[in-house]
């Protein structure tokens, strides 16, 4: 195992971004950015041993800080996903967060994702990043430090560990926003990739994709991924929790899950290459997002690739969206 560092580029007003490359003994490697403690690439073999990059991203570091391009690969904090009306209360005190998506907050306002993180520790097979947010920054209480540790193994396991510390009672919902395309060919949509989600319920949403406080059953609906099947089989079916033309952007409630219990949440499989990915988590939910909000004409990605509509699927482990405001949802 080895770790190498290189300069990735410069972002005005933020500084230089570095990439840390962790290579295992079999030649597979991951590249991690100081920008947003993000994943720049994951290069793993297909069934014939050929390496391919299975995540979307950019050659130009400045593209990563454009929120319209989907938070590619970036860590998200303080609070991932949605907060209705950009506010929540703790012990009777109301806190107001940025309205960066209409009338509500998305991904805590984006600060954690679009800033350069410190490198706290580097080992033979891991890198740990940290970011500090002062009390009341973006409306969140507490002097708050978040660390993200990435460890890569010879078995091609990428482990992500989040630690959050605050000197006041606060909220936290960290996740990672990497988009996967196991074909390693971004000209192919993720509609032909196979997905299984170990969940029989999802959080119901309104027309703005904000949780209503109800949980829906996946049974006999397009939301059912309890067995492995193609993402594209029903992605365009009309359904109350889906916005026409967007496809999946929904939180699934993992089977009878308790926080801290590590279980398998999802399986992603590409038939053409034989690549198979398991997602394990100790959190209670997973957001499945197929890039339906990305521009259909796309943006230049890495090499000759494109970052565009339905070219990658994000599998974001998390607490349920807007759980700070919904008492029925266990957190």
Task: Identify the residue ranges that each predicted region occupies.
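Acidic/His-leaning functional-site neighborhoods
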Residues: 107-112, 117, 244, 250, ...
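Well-ordered beta-strand scaffold positions
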Residues: 27-28, 93, 200, 275, ...
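Beta-strand-rich N-terminal accessory domains
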Residues: 6-58, 84-95
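Acidic, contiguous internal or C-terminal segments within carbohydrate-active enzymes
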Residues: 21-34, 132-187
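Active-site/ligand-binding surface loops and adjacent short beta/alpha elements
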Residues: 186-271, 276
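Extended, loop-rich substrate-binding clefts of extracytoplasmic carbohydrate-active enzymes
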Residues: 1-16, 21-25, 94, 98-155
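Conserved small/polar residues in nucleotide/adenosyl-binding loops
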Residues: 329-331
């Amino acid at each position: 195992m080895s770790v190498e560092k290189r300069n990735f580029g410069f972002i005005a007003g933020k500084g230089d971004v570095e990439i840390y490359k962790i290579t295992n003994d079999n030649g597979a490697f991951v590249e991690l950015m100081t920008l947003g403690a993000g994943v720049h690439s994951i290069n793993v073999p297909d069934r014939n041993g050929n390496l391919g990059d299975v995540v979307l991203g950019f050659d130009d570091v400045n593209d990563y800080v454009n929120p319209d391009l989907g938070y590619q690969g970036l860590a998200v904090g303080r609070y991932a996903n949605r907060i209705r009306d950009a506010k929540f209360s703790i012990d009777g005190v109301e806190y107001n967060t940025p309205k960066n998506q209409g009338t509500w907050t998305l991904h805590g306002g984006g600060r954690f994702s679009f800033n350069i993180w410190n490198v706290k520790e580097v080992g033979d097979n891991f890198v740990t990043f940290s970011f500090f947010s002062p009390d009341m920054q973006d409306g969140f209480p507490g002097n708050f430090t978040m660390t993200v540790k990435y460890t890569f193994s010879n078995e091609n396991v990428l482990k992500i560990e989040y630690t959050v510390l605050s000197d006041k009672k606060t909220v936290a919902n960290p996740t990672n926003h990497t988009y996967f395309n196991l074909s390693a060919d971004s000209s192919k949509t993720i509609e032909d990739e196979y997905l299984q989600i170990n969940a029989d319920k999802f959080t119901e949403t309104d027309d703005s994709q904000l949780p209503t406080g109800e949980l829906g059953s996946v049974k006999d609906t397009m939301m059912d991924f309890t067995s492995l099947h193609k993402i594209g089989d029903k992605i365009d079916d009309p359904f109350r929790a889906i916005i026409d033309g967007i496809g999946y952007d929904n939180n699934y409630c993992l089977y009878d899950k308790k926080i801290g219990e590590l279980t398998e949440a999802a399986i992603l499989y590409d038939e053409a290459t034989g690549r198979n990915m398991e997602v394990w988590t100790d959190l209670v939910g997973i957001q499945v997002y197929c890039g339906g909000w990305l521009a259909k004409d796309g943006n230049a990605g890495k090499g000759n690739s494109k970052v565009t509509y339905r070219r990658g699927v994000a599998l974001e482990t998390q607490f349920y969206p807007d759980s700070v405001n919904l008492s029925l949802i266990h957190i």
